Amino acid sequence: MHILIPAAGMGKRMGASHNKLRLQLLGKPLLAWTLAAVAAAEAIEWIGVIGQPEDFPIWEALLEDLNLRQPVHLITGGETRQASVFHGLQALPKTAEQVLIHDGARCLATPDLINRCAQALGTYAGLIAAVPVKDTIKIVNREGVVVQTPERDSLWAAQTPQGFRVEPLRIAHEMAVAKGWEVTDDAALFERLGYAVHIVLGEETNLKITTPSDLPLAERILQHRREQEQDTLG
């Protein structure tokens, strides 16, 4: 399985002046945790990290330290996440038939989740990791007035990995460029072409590191996992 990792986020909401994936989490850059989880997933055979050239020397040094078993390719991204994924699709090997796309900032995803998404691509043309929404969601108009309360049973919070067959996803991105479509995830493009996108149960801990308050929470989750591993070994 091939996987693309968008890793060009500037982290404005983190208050950082540089790529937020360079921020430290228990002594390692955020991206190191993401890459370690991806590399530990048995299904993954090829990794593409999509970023900006100014970060590449840092990522190259990181990759040397990690010494992952899979080949890792650094791919120059675009001005938006959507454009970056489009660039990543162009960089896939010609033999790639399926691809997972996983946000670099989701550094808490487990190898199990990544493997389950890869396995599900054997059945589905498109899928996303997602979890049921716990809160009641309100649809609000521009005046700040609630206009609808959707049934919570039908609402899921999208995560990554998201997985697709390569050719229809590439076509969807080409159409997006031609028609000026702008979406927040790749599944939305897939849906616009009429393809079904299936749900793979995600993980409550699969947070996207977005604001400063996410960092201490991520540290607690990772520390808890370390303690569990030590208890298992000990």
UniProtKB/Swiss-Prot annotation:
Class of enzymatic activity (EC top level): transferase
A GO MF term: 2-C-methyl-D-erythritol 4-phosphate cytidylyltransferase activity
Protein name: 2-C-methyl-D-erythritol 4-phosphate cytidylyltransferase
InterPro entries listed in its UniProt record: IspD (IPR001228), IspD/TarI (IPR034683), IspD/TarI_cytidylyltransf_bact (IPR050088), ISPD_synthase_CS (IPR018294), Nucleotide-diphossugar_trans (IPR029044)
Pfam families for the chain: IspD
Catalytic reaction equation(s): 2-C-methyl-D-erythritol 4-phosphate + CTP + H(+) = 4-CDP-2-C-methyl-D-erythritol + diphosphate
Keyword Transferase recorded: yes
Pathway(s) served: Isoprenoid biosynthesis; isopentenyl diphosphate biosynthesis via DXP pathway; isopentenyl diphosphate from 1-deoxy-D-xylulose 5-phosphate: step 2/6
Biological-process GO terms, alphabetical: isopentenyl diphosphate biosynthetic process, methylerythritol 4-phosphate pathway
The entry's keywords: Isoprene biosynthesis, Nucleotidyltransferase, Transferase
Lineage of the species this protein comes from: Bacteria, Bacillati, Cyanobacteriota, Cyanophyceae, Acaryochloridales
Database matches in HAMAP family: IspD
Site (Transition state stabilizer): 13, 20
UniProt-annotated site: Positions MEP for the nucleophilic attack, residues: 152, 208
Listed EC numbers: 2.7.7.60
Role this protein plays: Catalyzes the formation of 4-diphosphocytidyl-2-C-methyl-D-erythritol from CTP and 2-C-methyl-D-erythritol 4-phosphate (MEP).
Family: Belongs to the IspD/TarI cytidylyltransferase family. IspD subfamily.
